[in-house]
Each structure stands twice: as C-alpha cells, then as structure tokens.
C-alpha cells in the first residue's frame, strides 16, 4: 500500500517533511539554481502547480535546515549548508484589492518580517521598509540576504485589462520591488514566482540580469510531477489505484496520462502531470476533474468572447515564443492567457520556423473548458442537460449507432429555448464542435482539407472514421451530395478504418436538426 499520506492543501516544505508526507524530490533543481552564476530568477507556472511549495523548499534550504533534506538528492550534492537570512513574502493574499487595501497588505507582510528582525520603528513607504529589512538582515548576520517572493503578480491579475486600476496597482508594486535592484550587493539570491510577467514592473524593466527560467529546458520539470517521477517515486500509489479501479497497472498509467499529463514548458521538456489533479486522484481513488473544478474560468471565457475566439480556434495553434510567453495585459490575442493559465501547452517545436505548436494538454482540461463553453450556445439549464445527452451519445457512437446518437441530439436541441436560435450556420457548427469534443475518447478535427474541398468535421473512434458535413436550411441530402460530388472520403481511404459519411441539416426556425443521412463510403 502507499507509504505516505498526500500533502493536499499543504504548501510548507517543513511541515511535509516533519509529518512524513509524500514529497516529490525537486531538490536537484534547488541546488542547480542556487549554484549558478545568476542572482535573480523568475518562474511562471499555472495555478496549483507547486510554486509555493518550491518557494518554501528554497526557504528551508537557504536557512540551512539540513535535517529536513535527509534522503533527498540535495543531501549528497550540497557540502556546505550555509545559513543565510531569508525574507519571504507571499503576495497571494493581495488579490481583489483596491489601491489602499494593497498598500495596507504590503505593510502587513513587511511588518511580519520586521518583527523577526527586531525593527520596531520602520520606515513609512514600502520600498524603504524593504530596503531597511535587507540592510538590517545583512548587518545582523554578516551574510547576504535571500529574498523569496511568491505569486508576485497576484495583486495585478484581476485588473490586467482594466488600465486605470492596473496602472495604480502596478505603480505600488513597482515601488515595492525597486530595492531589489539597488540592494544588489547585499543580496545572495532572489527568486520570484507568478503566472505571468507583467510589463513595466521594476523586476523586469530594471533588473536586466534577471534569469527567466519559465521556458528553460533545464528547469522544465521543476514544478509538477514528471512521468519519470511518477513511475519511480509513486509506484505503490499506482498499484493502490489499480487495485481500487480493478485495472492493470499499465491501464492505470495510460488513464493517468490521458487525464492529467501532457504539459511541456520548453522546446525540450519531460512530460509533466498536473500535480494537484494527480495527487487528488490518488487520494480519492477516482479519475475526477480536480484542477479544473478548483477554479472557475469565468475570466478566461470572458476574454475568449472579447477576442471573438471560436471554440475550434482555441487549439491547436502555432505561435512564436514572443506570442505566448508575453505579458498578458498587452496581449493582442488570447494565446498568452491560454498558455500561462495552463489551458494550452507546448506540444511541438519546429527549429526551422521557430514555431511552437500549442494544444490543450489533456482530457481534464479539454472536457472542463468545453463544458464551460457550452452555455455560450445554450442556456444554463440546457447546458446541464447537455452533459447527460453527450454521455449517452458517446455510448451509442462506441456501439457504432450514429443514427441513435443523432436522434438523441435532435431531441436535446428541441429543448433549447428559442432565444438561442440563430440563422448563422457557424453557430451550429461551433455548437456541434463543442458537443462532439465532449464525446470523450474520440478524436475530432474540423474543416479538414481534401484535394477538392474541406470536410466540416472528422470524428475518429476506436472502430470507425466519420465524415460530417453540415447544412443550414437546406437538406441532409444536399450535404451528402456535396461529400459524394467532391469525393471527400478518398482523402481518408488509408486510415485503416471503415468510413461513414454523415450529412446533417439544421433548421434555423427551430434551432434543431431537421434531418440527417448516414451512408457507408
């Protein structure tokens, strides 16, 4: 059975080690970063990816708490274990704040550190208080100071696209961070984490020598759980889950990969699992939607609508690094937000064109995202019922009963209120795309090119390939005639599976499927 309990909700390295909970060993990365030529480092990763635990690990390492690192990789790497003064600031508590509230919050976290260092009459301004802290810690210990700032961008994320509020909060944060530059001689190591890198904040505009490790291949596995770590450090956990699910070990690993794997943070990167979902899956013994359920993507859905991004345009997509590893407050496309928030990830890199292929990482994200997009096309009650319909459709399609699946879909569409009916063909195509995407276990592609045109949708199941052509206010026969006239099926004859053509015609007056035709190619 699994030896250690899972550190769910615990982000403190010291507590995890003292309570002997599961810790995935990241200390080789800690040693590597602490012994490079750099002094300033920044790491961005999506929420709940282990950034706070990483910061806590750095804190205990630089405080020289060697006993906490017994049995870990760094025990054999580090020879000196020098104790440094550490200033640790967690800005995650600074969310959803106005200017005055943020200033008071910064004062609060500064006061906690000032008490540790015996500062009873601090300066007034936040930047001067941080400067005084650095100098006091340096003078009292005779050693350079380590500064750790977790979630540096938390106060600004909520107002990233509200220019007036953003400017006000950004000025406060710029002022707070400014001592990190002119106190350089007193500093041993500075590490900041966040989700995005805001432009015009002093740590990026003034610290020209800051090392950005977010897309560095040497640190691609510093957060999250790599496939190698899963297979070497969590063997008992896999066996316990397999026993609980009555599955083979190999089948469990494959399902874990399907649901929670797929992240890559560099051109060359190990496969990285979402740590929050993976640990919750092992703890609950269920393949649930944990990461997605822990945060509603309301803001993302709003921005998708603002940028007029259609569901089938989200991913896959190609982009230069500068197009997605970029400040989100000035983004011209949705790509930086999708990437930095963890909804898409790197899947490939072309050296010749320097283009990255970005795609949705795994089943949990794909299902969660498209499930949240469905209410854009149907009302809330209909969207909830849609989940039931989609599950039943998937079962029928697995049994090669496409006719039964479309009958279910027709019945479902007829429950959607009239206010969601439109005479725009693209609306029905996108709605159908979302629904077919939610038919988990299948592969879906849209507007697939053939020598003589484009197929609206191609659905690949374990047993069949379906070519789907849509029409609005015409006839299913017209859709089938187009597929036959242009010989769409010949483009797929080498797929090795039976090909079925499906013509679907929508009626804009009812908002439902009027008729359909199914033929074997």
What are these regions (language model features)?
Residues 166-171, 472-489:
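Mg2+/Mn2+-dependent nuclease catalytic core
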Residues 432, 455-472, 486:
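Conserved catalytic cores of phosphodiester-cleaving nucleases, focusing on short active-site segments
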Residues 136-141, 435-463:
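Active-site metal-binding core of divalent-cation-utilizing nuclease and nuclease-like domains
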Residues 146, 464-466, 500:
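Structural motif
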Residues 176-183, 336-344, 433-437, 482-502:
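Metal-dependent nuclease catalytic cores in nucleic-acid-processing enzymes
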Residues 1-424, 439-440:
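Phosphate-binding site recognition
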Residues 491, 495-521:
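Domain-level recognition of nuclease-like catalytic cores that cleave nucleotide substrates
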């Amino acid at each position: 059975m699994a030896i250690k309990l899972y550190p769910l909700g615990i982000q403190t390295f010291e507590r995890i080690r003292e309570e002997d909970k599961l810790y995935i060993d990241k200390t080789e990365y800690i040693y590597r970063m602490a012994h490079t030529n750099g002094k300033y480092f920044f790491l961005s990763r999506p929420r709940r990816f282990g950034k706070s635990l990483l910061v806590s690990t750095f804190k205990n390492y630089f405080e020289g708490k060697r006993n906490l690192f017994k049995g870990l990789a760094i025990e054999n790497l580090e020879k000196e274990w020098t104790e440094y003064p550490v200033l640790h600031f967690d800005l995650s508590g600074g969310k959803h704040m106005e200017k005055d509230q943020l200033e008071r919050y910064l004062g609060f976290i500064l006061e906690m550190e000032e008490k540790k260092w015996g500062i009873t009459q601090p300066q007034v301004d936040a930047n001067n208080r941080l400067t005084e802290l650095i100098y006091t810690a340096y003078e009292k210990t005779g050693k350079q100071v380590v500064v750790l700032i977790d979630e540096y961008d938390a106060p600004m994320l909520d107002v990233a696209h509200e220019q007036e509020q953003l400017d006000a909060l950004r000025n406060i944060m710029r002022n707070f961070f400014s001592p990190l530059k002119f106190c350089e001689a007193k500093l041993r190591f500075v590490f900041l984490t966040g989700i995005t890198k805001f432009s015009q904040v002093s740590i990026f505009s003034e610290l020209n020598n800051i090392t950005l490790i977010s897309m560095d291949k040497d640190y691609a596995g510093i957060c999250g759980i790599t496939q190698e770590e899963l297979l070497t450090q969590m063997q008992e956990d896999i066996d316990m889950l397999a026993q609980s699910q009555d599955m083979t070990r190999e089948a469990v690993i494959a399902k874990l990969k399907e649901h929670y794997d797929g992240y890559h943070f560099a051109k060359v990167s190990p496969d990285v699992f979402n740590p929050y979902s993976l640990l919750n899956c092992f703890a609950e013994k269920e393949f649930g939607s944990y990461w997605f359920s822990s945060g509603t993507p309301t803001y993302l859905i709003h921005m998708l609508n603002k940028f007029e991004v259609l569901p089938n345009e989200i991913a896959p997509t190609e982009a230069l690094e500068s197009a997605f590893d970029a400040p989100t407050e000035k983004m011209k496309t949705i790509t930086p937000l999708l990437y930095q928030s963890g909804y898409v990830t790197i899947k490939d890199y072309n050296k010749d064109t320097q283009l990255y292929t970005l795609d949705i990482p795994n089943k949990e994200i794909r299902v969660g995202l498209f499930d949240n997009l469905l209410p854009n096309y149907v009302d809330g009650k209909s969207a909830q019922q849609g989940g039931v319909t989609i599950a039943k459709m998937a079962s029928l399609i697995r049994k090669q009963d496409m006719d039964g699946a479309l009958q279910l879909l027709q019945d479902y569409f007829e429950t959607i209120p009239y206010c969601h009916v439109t005479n725009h063909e693209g609306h029905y195509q996108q709605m159908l795309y979302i629904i077919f995407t939610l038919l988990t276990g299948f592969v879906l592609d849209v507007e697939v090119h053939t020598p003589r045109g484009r197929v609206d949708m191609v659905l690949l199941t374990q047993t069949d390939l379906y070519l789907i052509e849509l029409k609005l206010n015409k006839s299913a026969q017209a859709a089938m005639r187009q597929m036959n006239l242009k010989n769409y099926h010949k483009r797929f004859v080498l797929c090795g599976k039976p090909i079925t053509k499906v013509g679907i015609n929508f009626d804009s007056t009812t908002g439902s499927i009027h008729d359909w035709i199914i033929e074997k190619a």
